[in-house]
A protein has these predicted regions:
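Basic/polar N-terminal segments that are highly enriched at the extreme N-terminus
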Residues: 21-28, 152-156
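A short, surface-exposed beta-strand/turn
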Residues: 97-123
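C-terminal partner/receptor-binding element of secreted or periplasmic proteins
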Residues: 114-156
Length: 156
């Protein structure tokens, strides 16, 4: 009878040993949500702008240094694969309210928060006599990978 009681206790405690093992190996990676992505973007933009609120960015295709003002984060922001998250934004050219850049940001976890790991100009402002300013895309996404439309690619 005592032996049976010991066997029952061992089997009863067996599932708990798995929990101890999981804790020893580290917790599962944190899942980040819309609010987390937007908060990370707000922190990044706030930390990056200068004293006048200007966001400076080197255009990875033209090499031009851009001086921009943040307008908005587009919905939806999302997780694109594994631990990579994505946000698309609009920035206005200083002194030209209708002239907008669409800037994309890739974020990854660093500890318990997301940080920006890559930034690209997705759409650049172009002017049309009929329509005024519009955003001309440089690339599209195929299976969440960047594919340049016109053969443009970033400069080293």
């Amino acid at each position: 009878m005592a032996r049976l009681a010991r066997i029952v206790r061992v089997f009863a405690l067996l599932p708990l040993s798995g929990l101890a093992l999981a804790a020893a190996e580290g917790a599962a990676p944190r899942t980040f949500y819309v609010e987390d992505i937007k908060a990370a973007m707000a922190r990044h933009i706030e930390a990056t702008v200068d004293a006048e609120g200007t966001f400076h960015l080197r255009d990875d295709v033209s090499g031009e240094r851009l001086a921009l003002q943040f307008v908005k984060i587009h919905d939806p922001v999302r997780r694109i694969d594994g631990d990579t998250y994505f946000a698309c934004t609009d920035f206005r050219v200083l002194g030209a309210p209708g002239k907008l850049y669409d800037i994309d940001f890739w974020l990854e976890p660093e500890g318990d928060r997301l940080v920006v790991v890559d930034t690209k100009v997705h759409k650049e402002p172009r002017h049309s006599l009929l329509y005024g300013w519009y955003k001309q895309p440089r690339y599209t996404f195929v299976d969440d990978e960047v594919v340049y439309i016109y053969g443009d690619s970033p400069r080293p």
